[in-house]
Regions:
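Non-catalytic terminal extensions of ATP-dependent helicases
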Residues: 4-8, 432, 439-542
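Intrinsically disordered, low-complexity accessory regions that flank the conserved helicase/ATPase core
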Residues: 1-50, 522-542
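Conserved segment of the helicase C-terminal RecA-like domain
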Residues: 388-432
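A short beta-strand element within the Helicase C-terminal
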Residues: 364-378, 401-404
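Conserved Walker B
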Residues: 181-182, 208-211, 312-315, 361-362, ...
Length: 542
C-alpha cells in the first residue's frame, strides 16, 4: 500500500523485531524431548526437499502430485515427517499458513499402511480441531490425500444433526475421524464410539493452543480417557504456552520430538505481515473501516480482506452496514447456520477478490488463499488471538498487511504487543465518507443495533478493570454507544435475566424489560438516525 496514512488507507512500512521462546522442559511434570529440532522458516515456506525423496507410498505420492499439485515440502512438513514416520510422538511449533495440516495427515496415512489393516469400523486416526470450519477444512484435505487409498475420512462437529452423523459412521468406514471436542464426547456417550477407537494408531491435536484457550482442557482429558495409551500422538500449535506444555507432558510419550519452525529470534507473527495500529475515537471506527477497505480495494484489484470483530453481533452489524452501502460482503459468525457458514467460507476461499466480515470462527487454521489485508476492529480477546487472526494473511510465503483499530479505552491492549513489529498509523475520517456512512447506518435494521448494544455491554463488562471503568461508567458508555454512535431511536431494552448474568443488577441507566420485541436482524425497519462510529460485541457464541 505504501505512503503515509490517509483517507485511502495507505501506510508506510514499519521495522521488524520481537521474539518468543519455549521452555517445555521446565513445565510442571514435563520431560524434556529427546529430539529438539529448530528449523526457522524464513521467507518462502517451501523447503528444498521434494516429496519424492521422502519415501512415501505410491498412492500417497500420486495424491500429492495429481490431486494436491505439490512437488516440494514446506519447512514444517520437511522437519516433522521424518520423526513422525519413525513412530515418535511430536510437538511441533509452526506459524499459521505453513502447511501444518498436510504435515500431520501425510505421516498418519503412512502409519495406517504399517501392520495389519484396520478392522471394519475402526477409527485408526483421530484428529481434534477447535472449530467446525477448521474441522471441515482438515476433512477435505484428508479426502484429497486419501484419493488413491482404500481408507475413508469422516468429520463430526456441533451444529449438525448428530443422528445423521451416527448413521453415516455406522454405515461407512471411518478410518480417519476429524472432530471438535464437544461433539466427539457426545458420540462417545451416545453412539458407542469407544470400542471403535480401541485400536487407535494416531491422535492429532491441531491448533493445540487454541483448543486450550477455548476451554477444551476438560474435554481433552475426557477424550484421552477413552482412547488407548499405546498410540502415536502429534501436537501442532502456533504457540507453546504452559498449558500446551502440560498437555504435552500428559499426552506424549517420553522421548518425543520437539520441532520448532519459529525459533528463538523470530516473532510469533509472520514477518511477511506489515502491521499497523490505529487508536481513534469510537465514533470514528465505522467510518475508518469503510475508508480503509475502499482505499485498499482501489489500490489492490485482486484484494481479499478479512475484518474481525469481537463477536457475532458486531460482525452482523458491520455486514448489514456494508450491504446498506451497496458493498457486497461475506458474513460468517456463530449466529449463522452451519450450512451458511460453510457456503460462505467456500465462496470467499474460491473468490478472486472480496471482503469477509467474521467473528473468531475464521481466526485459526482456516486457509483462505491470497488474503491481502486483515483488519481487527475492537479489542482482541488476547495477544494470541491477535496473532492468530493476523495469520490469515501472508500465507504460503506471500506478503500481507494487518491493521488493529482500537478506541482510546482499548489502548491498554497495545502493551501486550510491544515486542511485535507494529507501527502507529494515525488516521482521520474523510467528511464525505462520514456523511455516506451515517446515511447507510440509518438504514440498518434497528433490531441489529439493539442486539449490538447488548453484546457491546456484555463484551466490555469483562474488561472493566483493565479499562478503569466502574459498572456505572460501563452502562453510561454503552448507552451513549447505542444512542449517539448507532443512532438507536431510544435506549434498547435488555432482559432482566441477561442483566443478572452480567452481574449488573442494580446498576442505574439500564432499560430493563421482561421480553424483547420479536423479529431479528436482516430486515429494514430503519435505524432512527445515522449515528457515528462502531463498537465491538459481546463474547457471544462462536
Amino acid at each position: 500500500m505504501g505512503g503515509q496514512p490517509g483517507q485511502n488507507g495507505g501506510f508506510a512500512p514499519p521495522a521488524h523485531g520481537g521474539s518468543q521462546s519455549f521452555h517445555a522442559a521446565n513445565a510442571a511434570g514435563a520431560q524434556a524431548p529427546a529430539h529438539h529440532v529448530v528449523a526457522v522458516q524464513k521467507g518462502n515456506s517451501t523447503s528444498t526437499t521434494a516429496f519424492g525423496a521422502m519415501g512415501l507410498s505410491a498412492p500417497t505420492m500420486r495424491a500429492i502430485s495429481e490431486v494436491m499439485k505439490f512437488t516440494h515440502a514446506t519447512v514444517v512438513q520437511d522437519q516433522t515427517l521424518p520423526p513422525i514416520l519413525q513412530g515418535l510422538d511430536v510437538l511441533a511449533r509452526a506459524k499459521t499458513g505453513s502447511g501444518k495440516t498436510v504435515a500431520f495427515l501425510l505421516p498418519s496415512i503412512e502409519a495406517m499402511l504399517k501392520g495389519p489393516p484396520p478392522q471394519r469400523g475402526d477409527v485408526s486416526c483421530l484428529i481434534l480441531s477447535p472449530t467446525r470450519e477448521l474441522a471441515s477444512q482438515i476433512h477435505e484435505e484428508a479426502k484429497s490425500l486419501l484419493t488413491f487409498h482404500n481408507f475413508n475420512a469422516q468429520v463430526v462437529f456441533g451444529g449438525t444433526n448428530i443422528n445423521s452423523e451416527r448413521n453415516r459412521m455406522n454405515n461407512n468406514a471411518c478410518d480417519f475421524l476429524v472432530a471438535t471436542p464437544g461433539r466427539l464426547i457426545d458420540h462417545f456417550q451416545t453412539s458407542n464410539l469407544a470400542p471403535r477407537v480401541a485400536r487407535l494408531k494416531v491422535l492429532v491435536l491441531d491448533e493445540a493452543d487454541q483448543l486450550l484457550e477455548m476451554g477444551f482442557k476438560p474435554s481433552i482429558d475426557k477424550i484421552l480417557s477413552f482412547i488407548p495409551r499405546e498410540r502415536q500422538t502429534l501436537l501442532f500449535s502456533a504457540t507453546v504456552p504452559k498449558q500446551v506444555q502440560n498437555i504435552a507432558a500428559n499426552a506424549l510419550r517420553p522421548g518425543y520430538a520437539y520441532v520448532d519452525c519459529v525459533g528463538e529470534e523470530d516473532s510469533a507473527t509472520n514477518l511477511q505481515v506489515t502491521q499497523w495500529l490505529t487508536v481513534a475515537p469510537l465514533d470514528d471506527h465505522l467510518h475508518l473501516l469503510v475508508q480503509l477497505i475502499t482505499g485498499h480495494q482501489q489500490q489492490v484489484p485482486d484484494h481479499k480482506v478479512i475484518c474481525f470483530f469481537p463477536t457475532a453481533r458486531a460482525t452482523q452489524l458491520a455486514a448489514e452496514l456494508f450491504v446498506a452501502l451497496g458493498k457486497p460482503v461475506t458474513e460468517i459468525h456463530s449466529r449463522k447456520s452451519q450450512g451458511h457458514r460453510t457456503k460462505a467460507a467456500d465462496q470467499f476461499r474460491d473468490a478472486k477478490s472480496g471482503v469477509m466480515m467474521s467473528s473468531d470462527v475464521s481466526a485459526r487454521g482456516l486457509d483462505y488463499p491470497d488474503v491481502t489485508l486483515v483488519i481487527q476492529v475492537g479489542l482482541p480477546s488476547s495477544r494470541e488471538q491477535y496473532i492468530h487472526r493476523l495469520g490469515r494473511t501472508a500465507r504460503a510465503g506471500k506478503t500481507g498487511e494487518g491493521l488493529l483499530l482500537l478506541a482510546p479505552h482499548e489502548a491498554f491492549f497495545a502493551r501486550q504487543l510491544k515486542d511485535l513489529p507494529i507501527s502507529d498509523a494515525p488516521a482521520q475520517v474523510d467528511p464525505n465518507t462520514a456523511h455516506v456512512v451515517s446515511q447507510a447506518l440509518a438504514r440498518v435494521d434497528v433490531r441489529t443495533k439493539e442486539q449490538a448494544y447488548v453484546a457491546w455491554l456484555g463484551f466490555y463488562n469483562g474488561s472493566c478493570g483493565k479499562m478503569g471503568w466502574s459498572k456505572e461508567v460501563l452502562v453510561q458508555n454503552a448507552n451513549r454507544y447505542a444512542l449517539e454512535v448507532l443512532g438507536c431511536p431510544g435506549l434498547p431494552g435488555i432482559m432482566k435475566k441477561t442483566v443478572g448474568m452480567m452481574g449488573l443488577k442494580g446498576v442505574p441507566g439500564l432499560n430493563l424489560v421482561s421480553e424483547l420485541p420479536g423479529g431479528g436482524g436482516g430486515g429494514n425497519r430503519g435505524g432512527g438516525g445515522g449515528g457515528r462510529g462502531f463498537g465491538g460485541g459481546g463474547r457471544g457464541r462462536r
